């Protein structure tokens, strides 16, 4: 992009753009360094040569190119600041205006307005009529607004659309050579296109000219001093309200999914090795030692519990072979059999199905049948340690049948109820102070 074509239209209003000014001595020397060769300038030319000077001196920041550092340059002494930003055009215009003197020369104004009038197309009769009725435009607008609210809303939308076109048209850009320049917009071309459209319909032309005049009067400062960082061309798409939907909102919702297992896994237990796993006889699947079922086919593990029936059979056989018991059972007693078959005083049975207490002879026979269980309990007392036969150390009432398991070991020192309470309250094992993994109801056989 050539430096001479950097400034196509000033960011200043029309009146200030056509106003002739004379820079002071210090500012004039800076403009002459940028290539200026005259004494009187327009504001457009002052901005052009000032941008050319900043480009040649490379006073702009390499990272943030809209910031100009002029503290060690004569430009800083002229403007009275060490740095400024082109994003604040009002402040920049105020700094430059201090070093300018207004020149009132109608001849020079006419010479300046001639090329501008040549560059613009001929004005049609619609524009002439709109200029003649400009004095009564405000009254007509008020009447239209009061009579037709829909047309007033349409005018407001078109006026706001023109505001966006003008405010979006000014931008600051840097080409491949990092040239610093201010690019004007398409306000003049769009104004000409609107005036050419007004020739076809005089009423529409009047309303458009009135809307443009009102927007220029009310928004001259905000529109003419807006700065952006992209260059728009004539063929660029117009602003549409649908583009607002594409802009992401401030509030964004993030959905986070956490994957975790619902059940505890035995694979993480460091105390369980592969040697402890058991193999299913049906599907040949290796399973952890604690579950009793296979994970694949749900088959119960063989030898999961001891065979209690065989023990009972062995104990019953031992009691039958005992000579003392056989003497009791084989002794012929006809009177005992008669009393069993024909009791002397038959006992009735209640309607509720509750049996009447048995006579002493029947109790004697049942006690003879319970003798194997007593012998079995006596054998357990002989083989188990004395601490296992003591009551629970916590409640001192129930037997010790609640094994506190932690890892591959456990302690049998409390009943199942007390041990379960310790587990639910997240207490430690009272013996070894280890975390309680589970509580097992223990049967002594």
UniProtKB/Swiss-Prot annotation:
UniProt motif Nuclear localization signal: location: 160-166
Classification via InterPro entries: Mdm2 (IPR028340), MDM2_mRING-HC-C2H2C4 (IPR044080), p53_neg-reg_MDM_2/4 (IPR016495), SWIB_MDM2_dom_sf (IPR036885), SWIB_MDM2_domain (IPR003121), Znf_RanBP2 (IPR001876), Znf_RanBP2_sf (IPR036443), Znf_RING (IPR001841)
Compositionally biased region (Low complexity): 193-209
Main EC class the enzyme belongs to: transferase
Zinc fingers, RanBP2-type class: 274-303
Region (ARF-binding): 190-279
Enzyme Commission code(s) on record: 2.3.2.27
Region entry Region II, spans: 222-306
Nucleolar localization signal, short sequence motif: residues: 420-427
Zn-finger region bounds: RING-type: 392-433
PROSITE patterns (alphabetical): SWIB_MDM2, ZF_RANBP2_1, ZF_RANBP2_2, ZF_RING_2
Catalytic activity: S-ubiquitinyl-[E2 ubiquitin-conjugating enzyme]-L-cysteine + [acceptor protein]-L-lysine = [E2 ubiquitin-conjugating enzyme]-L-cysteine + N(6)-ubiquitinyl-[acceptor protein]-L-lysine
Family statement: Belongs to the MDM2/MDM4 family.
Function: E3 ubiquitin-protein ligase that mediates ubiquitination of p53/TP53, leading to its degradation by the proteasome.
Stated name of the protein: E3 ubiquitin-protein ligase Mdm2
């Amino acid at each position: 992009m050539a430096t001479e074509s950097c400034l196509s239209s000033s960011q200043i209003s029309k009146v200030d753009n056509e106003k002739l000014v004379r820079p002071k001595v210090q500012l004039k020397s800076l403009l002459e360094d940028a290539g200026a060769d005259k004494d009187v300038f327009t504001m457009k030319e002052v901005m052009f040569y000032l941008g050319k000077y900043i480009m040649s001196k490379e006073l702009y920041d390499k990272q943030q190119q809209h910031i100009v550092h002029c503290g060690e340059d004569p430009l800083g002494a002229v403007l009275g600041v060490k740095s400024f930003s082109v994003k604040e055009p009002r402040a920049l215009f105020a700094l430059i205006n201090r070093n300018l003197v207004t020149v009132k020369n109608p001849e020079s104004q006419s010479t300046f307005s001639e090329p501008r009038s040549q560059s613009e197309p001929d004005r049609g009769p619609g524009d002439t009529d709109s200029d003649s009725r400009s004095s009564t435009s405000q009254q007509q607008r008020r009447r239209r607004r009061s009579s037709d609210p829909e047309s007033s809303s349409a005018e407001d939308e078109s006026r706001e659309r023109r505001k966006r076109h003008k405010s979006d048209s000014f931008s600051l850009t840097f080409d491949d050579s990092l040239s610093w320049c201010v690019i004007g917009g398409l306000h003049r071309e769009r104004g000409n296109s609107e005036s050419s459209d007004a020739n076809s319909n005089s009423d529409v032309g009047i309303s458009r000219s009135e809307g443009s005049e009102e927007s220029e009067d009310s928004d001259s400062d905000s529109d003419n001093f807006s700065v952006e960082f992209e260059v728009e061309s004539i063929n660029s798409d117009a602003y549409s309200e649908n583009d607002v939907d594409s802009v992401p909102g401030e509030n964004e919702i993030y959905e986070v999914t956490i994957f975790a297992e619902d059940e505890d896994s035995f694979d993480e237990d460091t105390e369980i090795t592969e040697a402890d796993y058991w193999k299913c006889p049906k599907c040949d699947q290796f399973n952890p030692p604690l579950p009793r079922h296979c994970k694949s086919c749900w088959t119960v593990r063989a030898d999961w519990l001891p065979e209690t029936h065989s023990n009972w059979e062995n104990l019953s056989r031992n009691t039958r072979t005992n000579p003392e018991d056989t003497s009791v059972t084989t002794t012929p007693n006809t009177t005992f059999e008669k009393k069993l078959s024909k009791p002397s005083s038959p006992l009735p049975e209640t309607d509720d199905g509750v049996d009447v207490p048995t006579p002493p002879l029947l109790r004697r026979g049942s006690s003879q049948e319970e003798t194997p269980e007593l012998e079995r309990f006596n054998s357990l007392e002989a083989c188990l340690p004395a601490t296992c036969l003591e009551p629970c150390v916590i409640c001192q009432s129930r037997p010790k049948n609640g094994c506190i398991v932690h890892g591959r070991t456990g302690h049998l020192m409390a009943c199942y109820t007390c041990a379960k309470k310790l587990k639910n309250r997240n207490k430690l094992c009272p013996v070894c102070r280890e975390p309680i993994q589970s509580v097992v109801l223990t049967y002594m056989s």
